[in-house]
Amino acid sequence: NYNAHLAAYPQVDWEAFARRFVESLGLEFNPYTTQIEPHDALAEAFDAVARLNTIVVDLDRDVWGYVSLGYFRQKLVAGEVGSSTMPHKVNPIDFENAEGNLGVANALLAHFSHKLPISRWQRDLTDSTVLRNMGVALGYAVLAYQSLMSGLGKLEVNPQALQDDLDAAWEVLAEPVQTVMRAHGLPNPYEQLKALTRGKGITQDSMRAFIAGLDLPAPEKER
């Protein structure tokens, strides 16, 4: 408050003076604070970074899985070792590093966003030691982003693996086939496809036989 200022210079409108001074520096004036500027904006920013990091973790895990399934191949890097005992191994290490570093970053960011809005009797200094670690949290996040970009740069699609999986999953045609059946007014398309595909291994021959038996125009069957 301006009590001491007002006692010394009662003729001055201290709030107006403070506003002019702060805004002259290009800053936003906050008329209501405790002994320090509230950390609410910092907490909001840290929460936003943590949400971004969570999205990146989701991407890391998905790409790691696609590499494991063989949908993506990783370009070889000369001199890189994937395993101490398996010389053939090419690890998705960049995505693992990114995920691990983001876990550390988000642990710190969560503490920041929970701690910084709180000040015991509006005057304790526990925020000081916490604020000194902002760079640590953001540094781990930046390392993770760099690892992610490095990993993405090494990826190449494995079309053969995608084609092999697609050729082994004829049941995925259940949705478009039943939609065409509906468009032509055939009865119970969902139930028919459910009976054909649910819990069963569908082959190209069985799907072709089912389509051949439908009362559909020849051009639709050929598609």
Task: Spell out what each predicted region is.
Residues 81-223:
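Catalytic-core signal marking the mid-to-C-terminal active-site face
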